[in-house]
Amino acid sequence: MELVNITCLGLGLAADAFAVSLSSGFVIQRIKFNKALKIALFFGIFQAIMPLIGWLTGLSFREFMTNIDHWIAFILLLGIGSKMIYEAYKEMDDDDKFNPLDTYTLLALAIATSIDALAAGLGLSLLKTSILLPCTLIGLITFVLSFIGVFIGHKFGSIFNKKIEIIGGLTLIIIGSKILIEDLIKPI
């Protein structure tokens, strides 16, 4: 697979992680390098590992995964997005609010945004190509875009305050819905 094609694949797969990083940046109160790094590492590592998992499982697991992957992503993003919107309206202690730095939340977000990368790995297994370069580039591109996305999101979050939490939650729900709809309406 050519470098240009792999880069384009990486950019396409990183789009959801970038959008979720923006949403995460919206709600982070005091931005620090290590906070953005944690989010970027979760997304980058998952985006790098999922194509490898997809590639290794190949065709035997492909049919099962393609039947449920969109539902998993949709449910995770719908739940997290709804929680963000709920918390924007409800008066809560800071300890109870949506925390994009919570390890379990990050794990759910990383899985939800990397399911497409798993499917891409399944597709790459059909090409009988090496998986090392695609995994590395996909992970690096996602890491960089996610890292930048947290800072951009934080900048806008500090300007718009609570409204941005609602926008962030809606963004997650829209991404989840997009994943679900695209998989449900694709030709058989």
Curated annotation (Swiss-Prot):
One term under GO cellular component: plasma membrane
Keyword Cell membrane part of the UniProt annotation: yes
Localization per record: Cell inner membrane
Transmembrane residue ranges: 8-28, 39-59, 68-88, 106-126, 131-151, 164-184
Topological category with respect to the lipid bilayer: Multi-pass membrane protein
Protein family (similarity comment): Belongs to the MntP (TC 9.B.29) family.
Function: Probably functions as a manganese efflux pump.
Protein name (record): Putative manganese efflux pump MntP
Protein's organism: Crocosphaera subtropica (strain ATCC 51142 / BH68) (Cyanothece sp. (strain ATCC 51142))
Source lineage: Bacteria, Bacillati, Cyanobacteriota, Cyanophyceae, Oscillatoriophycideae
